[in-house]
Each structure stands twice: as structure tokens, then as C-alpha cells.
Amino acid sequence: MAVPTELHGGSVKETAAEKESRVLEPGAAPFGNFPHYSRFHPPEQRLRLLPPELLRQLFPESPENGPILGLDVGCNSGDLSVALYKHFLSLPDGKTCSDASREFRLLCCDIDPVLVKRAEKECPFPDALTFITLDFMNQRTRKVLLSSFLSQFGRSVFDIGFCMSITMWIHLNHGDHGLWEFLARLSSLCRYLLVEPQPWKCYRAAARRLRKLGLHDFDHFHSLTIRGDMPNQIVQILTQDHGMELICCFGNTSWDRSLLLFRAKQTIETHPIPESLIEKGKEKNRLSFQKQ
């Protein structure tokens, strides 16, 4: 994906501005590792749909049993990770809380080391948010890094996982089986899972951007059989194949992506779903749960 500095048959060189323009072009981020993602999908659009008290509702026993442990997969430069952290702890802008890390600890991972480095540098809660470079599809590395984090708290799973606009990139780069495996691993690692799937139109747009830049197409795009209504497809895989249940649809962002909350069926039954989420979850009936 490197851009040549000199054209064949001539001595015309790209200017720094031209080179940066191509690097920052969305199509030049085939893993979704956009350098300024929050500029076109601001965190506030997600936060307005999520109740600030969500974690307190799901985990009323914390912090007596230790901090709530979260996993954010595909965290990019950490803007949304930090925003979610502040939102769920009701921390106003510009304010930190010395006790916050005892309530909620968040492990954030991304495939891009440059973005992870930026996230570490700019994070206002270094005691509570940990950023690591990780290709989540690398089984060996994933197991080592995630187990190392969980062992600090004597845990084997995370309380909640965040999968925000990452499913498409896994799907395009690893195919149908890769998406299935990705969701399998997440569901085995998290008691609850908040997923924001990209709709199929985003797949087509991502492929067009690559072609526009003259880059190699996604290896699996034309061979994908899991397609169409992607939120529904994600629901089918998680509920029918991976032992989770959809308990709430929080609605859609302004860019038409749904926020879906799942719960592992093996989660202790004495831990009831809050009534407010049950009522909110009736919105899920807007989704068609029939296989396509």
C-alpha cells in the first residue's frame, strides 16, 4: 500500500500534501484503521442512544466484587473508548475521578500501532484504560494478551465487550468463516456484548473506495455468502450459533447503524435483566429474525 514517490518514465514526485491526501483517504485504511475516525462518526451519536446508567443496571454488585471489566475491540485512536468510559461513569468533560479505575477498567485494542500510540498519549484516564496493539484474529497473541489482563483481576472473562463498527472489516478481510470465528471468540470472552454492525451498503462503499484508489480489492468481498441485512445476520450468528440472546436494541445512529446489546445465556440466572432494558428491548421487534 506504499505510495511511490517517483512515477515511471518521469521525474514527477508527489508533494507531501498529495501523499498525505492519499494516506488519509478512507479507502487506504482496509482494516478500518482511519486516522481521524471520530471526525466523521463522532462518539456523541452513540452516547445519546446509550443510558448512562447501563453498566450500573447490568452489574449492580460492582464494585464490591471488583471493577467492571470491559473489552473494546477496534478502538482506533481511543476517542470512543474514552467517551464511553466517561459516559458510563457520568464524568463531566475536563474532570477525572481518582476512584474511577476501581469501578470500571477497559482494555482497548486495535490492529494499528500508530493509532494505539496516539490513544495512549491522549488518554485522560491512564489508570483505567489500557491500550494495546492486537490483531484480534491472531489466536495465540489474543490469548496471551487478554489472559494477562484478566488474570490481574482473577477473572477468566470480561463483563462487557464493545464491538463498534468493526464487524465489516473482519468480514471483508477474513471472509464468512472469519466473521463467524470473530463473533464466537467475542461471545466466549464476554458476559455482555454491545455490537454496532455496519450495514451492507457500507461493504459496497468500502469496495468502491479501494477501486477508486487503484488498490487491490478485498480478498473475500465477492465470495461472501453472509450478506444483505447485516444487523439481522449478526443477530442470527450470535443467538443461534454462539449462545447469546439479544436483550436490547438502543436504536440507530444518524448514519443508520444499530446498537445491539447481547447477553451470554450462561450468565447466572439470578442476575436478572433490568426492567428498563426489557422495555427498551421491545424495539428489537423492528428487526426481522428470519434467515435470509
UniProtKB/Swiss-Prot annotation:
* Compartments, as annotated in UniProt: Cytoplasm
Record-listed E.C. numbers = 2.1.1.-
> What Gene3D superfamilies does this protein's entry cite?
Vaccinia Virus protein VP39
The protein's annotated catalytic reaction(s) are: a 5'-end 5'-phospho-ribonucleoside-RNA + S-adenosyl-L-methionine = a 5'-end (5'-methylphospho)-ribonucleoside-RNA + S-adenosyl-L-homocysteine; a 5'-end 5'-phospho-ribonucleoside-RNA + 2 S-adenosyl-L-methionine = a 5'-end (5'-bismethylphospho)-ribonucleoside-RNA + 2 S-adenosyl-L-homocysteine
Q: What keywords tag this UniProt record?
A: Cytoplasm, Methyltransferase, S-adenosyl-L-methionine, Transferase
The UniProt GO MF terms for this protein read: RNA methyltransferase activity; small RNA 2'-O-methyltransferase activity; tRNA methyltransferase activity
The question of whether Transferase is a record keyword is answered with yes
- Broad EC category: transferase
As for family, the record states: Belongs to the methyltransferase superfamily.
Which named protein is this? Answer: RNA 5'-monophosphate methyltransferase
Source organism of this protein record? Pongo abelii
